[in-house]
Amino acid sequence: MTKGPISNFIETHYKHFNAAALVDAAKGYEAHLTEGGKMMITLAGAMSTAELGKSLAEMIRQGKVDIISCTGANLEEDIMNLVAHSHYKRVPNYRDLSPQDEWDLLENHYNRVTDTCIPEEEAFRRLQKHIYKIWKDAEDNGERYFPHEFMYKILLSGELQQYYEIDPKNSWMLAAAERNLPMVVPGWEDSTMGNIFASYVIKGELKASTMKSGIEYMTWLAKWYPENSGGKGVGFFQIGGGIAGDFPICVVPMLYQDMEMTDIPFWSYFCQISDSTTSYGSYSGAVPNEKITWGKLDIHTPKFIVESDATIVAPLMFAWILGW
């Protein structure tokens, strides 16, 4: 592949320290795919609100990612950006906000993520109106689905097209839905849509069982992993920390130790982008070698860690992999 201007800039200038780690990790990702490997990307933090879809969607379309694990927030916030982008409010001076300023944002139905405020009415409620119908229809038909499957349904139905406010090619969730990309969403309950779903259960309008659970995500992943880990194996590209990464990486030791599948391959590539510093008792800040003791990575697994802001690093790495 002929590399474009962004890749050439990275190759020329990123020679040392975290910059060099970025290049090494990107080249490792590229080599893993070239040798026939598959890749899981995990999304923590507010990557969807950071509009990672501008590069991640193309990664999905070009087959550079085979499965995604993400938080419930990332699952919904990409779609919220798709349907309410013009209503978002940026607050560059967020460090100077007083408690009263924050209260004023709440009174105006804005929920702040660092310098970006998500508009409650246009984002959350607009989506709620349509997703409830899909939840209810499934329940009435005796059907049960995973959280991401419901989101795929609403995107592919075309019902949200009337609200699109960005170029749909920049929505990674739309790209994933169009490819029916495998996905796990651990801890989905900890999200706006999860809270809304719970409210309908409390009101007696929906049954909790209509939504497939986290345990069912793990049992599904326990089937997917052995079917896809032959040859070069499956790599693990972790953006941020938290449950989006901690949950799926455990499928390997679970299969090995609890299912006694002693020939199950370890993850065959590992990279984490995180600004969580190595500290006492922190899983997100742990160095990759610690994962060897948990039966997640092999001694010989290529391991990379880029200790930097993922909103800066991930698009650059994706640009390299895409040849931009």
For the regions a language model picked out, list residue spans one by one.
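Glycine-rich phosphate/diphosphate-binding loops that line cofactor/substrate pockets in enzymes
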Residues: 25-39, 175-179, 223-233
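N-terminal glycine-rich anion-binding loop in soluble enzyme alpha/beta folds
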Residues: 1-33
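A generic, well-ordered mixed alpha/beta core segment in the N-terminal half of proteins
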Residues: 60-127
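C-terminal functional extensions of proteins
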Residues: 17-20, 243, 250, 257-324
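A glycine- and small-aliphatic-rich helix-loop capping segment at beta-alpha/alpha-beta transitions
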Residues: 55-65, 82-93, 201, 252-261, ...
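Short acidic, glycine/serine/threonine-rich loops at helix termini
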Residues: 51-54, 79-85, 195-199, 248-252, ...
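Glycine-rich anion-binding loop/nest that anchors nucleotide
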Residues: 39-48, 68, 184-188, 206-283
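Ligand-binding beta-strand-loop-alpha-helix segment within the catalytic cores
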Residues: 101-192
